[in-house]
């Protein structure tokens, strides 16, 4: 049976794991790393890079390098968070045809789901390379506080990448699975997950294979990227004070600042001070300018203190919803790279009144949990029951624009709730129902999920028709809706007009685009491999020609040199078949050279044998050493 992989699709880094016997194993990528940067780059030559190769060239290609796209997924273009992001990233964020936030590269628009699919494809290839077989099914993680649109967009990304997404699982829940799989005694734990772009806090009761989420809360626009941008702003402001030049208008300089900020942030987790040194950051009429400054841990902590404090309110809300006090939490599990920051650990310790648990790898534990869930769904992992919750309330807009909740937040999923609606006017044959998700009291302050047009209602006085609408949240946290006319018993077909997202046709086109790109990538890889083989063949043939060229005729030598020249001439092209044909030709004409090499080698071996034979005829004489010292 083909394996189900677990993927942590992160804002900054992604990770893939698979069940290996009874344990989850993180798979190393082609660069030998256990995590892969969630970065996609589009070069001027039309090449597409994913992961570490994309991140490496970001400084020289800032506008063509897309990072932290998870913060855009499932969001509208006019979302205030998107507006904020537009001012911070060097790549272009544009309005998609459906009104969502998309990115534009080389005059082509890409949805965040497409960019995410490119990262997922990389993770899929990593797993396939390790397993030696095709991978078609996956469990993908999302922040617990993701809404329906963001979850659906993540599922779409999996489909575009050629994966059947068996389950969308919350990141803190996945971490709890990996942490508590071998724990038999009952415990109440809190998972504090501060990653590259999002923050989640979940409270769970675990024990004897049952993982029950009691509550969850969070902030989908708070993470390591925000800490980096705080430092970028600080560096740019200090440089402006010193040199009078604003680096915020220079995309190349901003990318260098971001790289330096990330490095400084990491270094300050283990040292009290670091030095930022960026030579030739910019130039003016007086010449090149260099940025050099020292940064202490204390200064960094003061710059990001408001970000750290923003994690406390969701923690309070999660505890309140779970009906618990901080002292009733048995263990606090830290997840996400940002939890390595000493200040974060200190704040968590102060809030919960206990040292946080550091026994799990914060970068890998989520992917491992996803792999375990994959094992559960496949039947390989027995006696594990996962009870998750919906993070946000689900409801409809009622008279006066009020948000009327049908399913409260932190309701265990899957769940179903029905509500009966009627008409507002006589002989009304259609009703429009607007479905929202969120916690605000007015509907328009929440996230519009979809608009339902119930058509074909029989003519009747207002308030008479009884239309039962059922809201259903599945195990992925994704909302489904059905409707029935109770008067006639007839099921009504609901035409869902999502407020954004991708249509089936969009996804189909993107799948085809991904497949064609996969074919292009395969062709490009074949070209590179063929060129590498050709260059190795040219090198070895030229070396042999230098050493043994005098052992073949001038005519043979001329043919070999001509074949080498022909092969070199096609190396600059993109036709691997032509390169292979020229390699074959060179191999054929070089046969006489190889023959000469073997003959020379055999002659040398025979000469050595004769010499050894001659040495065998020599008789060893006995001798006695006389120590004759003259006095």
UniProtKB/Swiss-Prot annotation:
CDD domains: ASKHA_NBD_HSP70_HSPA9 (cd11733). The keyword Cytoplasm does not apply. The keyword Chaperone applies. PROSITE patterns: HSP70_1, HSP70_2, HSP70_3. Induction: By stress conditions e.g. heat shock. The modification Phosphothreonine is found at residue 198. GO terms for molecular function: ATP binding; ATP-dependent protein folding chaperone; unfolded protein binding. InterPro entries: ATPase_NBD, Chaperone_DnaK, Heat_shock_70_CS, HSP70_C_sf, HSP70_peptide-bd_sf, Hsp_70_fam. Pfam families: HSP70 (PF00012). Keywords: ATP-binding, Chaperone, Nucleotide-binding, Phosphoprotein, Stress response. It comes from the Bacteria. Belongs to the heat shock protein 70 family. HAMAP family: DnaK. Acts as a chaperone. This is Chaperone protein DnaK. It comes from Bartonella bacilliformis (strain ATCC 35685 / KC583 / Herrer 020/F12,63).
């Amino acid at each position: 049976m083909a394996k189900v992989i677990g993927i942590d699709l992160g804002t900054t880094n992604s990770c893939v794991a698979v069940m290996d016997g009874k344990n989850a194993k993180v798979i190393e990528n082609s660069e030998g790393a256990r995590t892969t940067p969630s970065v996609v780059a589009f070069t001027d030559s039309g090449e597409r890079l994913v992961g570490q190769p994309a991140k490496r060239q970001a400084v020289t290609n800032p506008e063509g390098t897309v990072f932290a796209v998870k913060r855009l997924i499932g969001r509208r273009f006019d979302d205030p968070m998107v507006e904020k992001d537009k001012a911070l990233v060097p790549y272009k964020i544009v309005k998609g045809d459906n009104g969502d936030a998309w990115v534009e590269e080389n005059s082509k628009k890409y949805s965040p789901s497409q960019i995410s699919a490119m990262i997922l494809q990389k993770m899929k290839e990593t797993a396939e390379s390790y397993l030696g077989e095709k991978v078609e099914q996956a469990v993908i993680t999302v922040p617990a506080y993701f809404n329906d649109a963001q979850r659906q967009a993540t599922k779409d990304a999996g489909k575009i990448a050629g994966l059947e997404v068996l389950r969308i699982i919350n990141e803190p829940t996945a971490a709890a699975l990996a942490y508590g799989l071998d724990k038999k005694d009952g415990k109440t734990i809190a998972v504090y997950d501060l990653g590259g772009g999002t923050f989640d806090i979940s409270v769970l009761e675990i024990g004897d294979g049952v993982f029950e989420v009691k509550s969850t809360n969070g902030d989908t626009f708070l993470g390591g990227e925000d800490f980096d941008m705080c430092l970028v702003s600080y560096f740019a402001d200090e440089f402006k004070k010193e040199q009078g030049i604003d680096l915020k208008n220079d995309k190349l300089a901003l990318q260098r600042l971001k790289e330096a900020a990330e490095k400084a942030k990491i270094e300050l987790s283990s040292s009290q001070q670091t030095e930022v040194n960026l030579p030739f950051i910019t130039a003016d009429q007086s010449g090149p300018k260099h940025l050099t400054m020292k940064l202490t841990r204390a200064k960094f902590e003061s710059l990001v203190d408001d970000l750290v404090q923003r994690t406390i309110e969701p923690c309070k809300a999660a505890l309140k919803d779970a009906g618990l006090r901080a002292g009733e939490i048995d263990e606090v599990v830290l997840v996400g790279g940002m939890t390595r920051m000493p200040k974060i650990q200190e704040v968590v310790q102060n809030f919960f009144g206990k040292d946080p648990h550091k026994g799990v790898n914060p970068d890998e534990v989520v992917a491992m949990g996803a792999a375990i869930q994959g094992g559960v769904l496949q039947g390989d992992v027995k006696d594990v029951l996962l009870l998750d919750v919906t993070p946000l309330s689900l409801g409809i807009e009622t008279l006066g624009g009020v948000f009327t909740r049908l399913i409260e937040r932190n309701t265990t999923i899957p769940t179903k709730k029905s509500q009966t609606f009627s008409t507002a006017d006589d002989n009304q044959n259609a009703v429009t129902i607007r479905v929202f998700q969120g916690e605000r009291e007015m509907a328009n302050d929440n996230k519009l999920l979809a608009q339902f047009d119930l058509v074909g209602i029989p003519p009747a006085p207002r308030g008479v028709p009884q239309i039962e609408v059922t809201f259903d949240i599945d195990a992925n946290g994704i909302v489904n809706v059905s409707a029935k006319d109770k008067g006639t018993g007839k099921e009504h077909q609901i035409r869902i007009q999502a407020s954004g997202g991708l249509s089936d046709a969009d996804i189909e086109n993107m799948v085809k685009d991904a497949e064609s790109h996969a074919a292009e990538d395969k062709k490009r890889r074949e070209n590179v491999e063929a060129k590498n083989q050709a260059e190795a063949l040219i090198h070895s043939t030229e070396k042999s020609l230098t050493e043994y060229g005098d052992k073949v005729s001038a005519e043979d030598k001329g043919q070999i040199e001509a074949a080498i020249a022909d092969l070199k001439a096609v190396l600059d092209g993109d036709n691997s078949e032509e390169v292979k044909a020229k390699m074959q030709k060179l191999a054929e004409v070089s046969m006489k050279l190889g023959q000469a090499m073997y003959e020379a080698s055999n002659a040398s071996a025979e000469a050595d044998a004769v010499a050894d034979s001659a040495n065998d005829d020599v008789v060893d004489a006995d001798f006695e050493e006389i120590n004759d010292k003259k006095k």
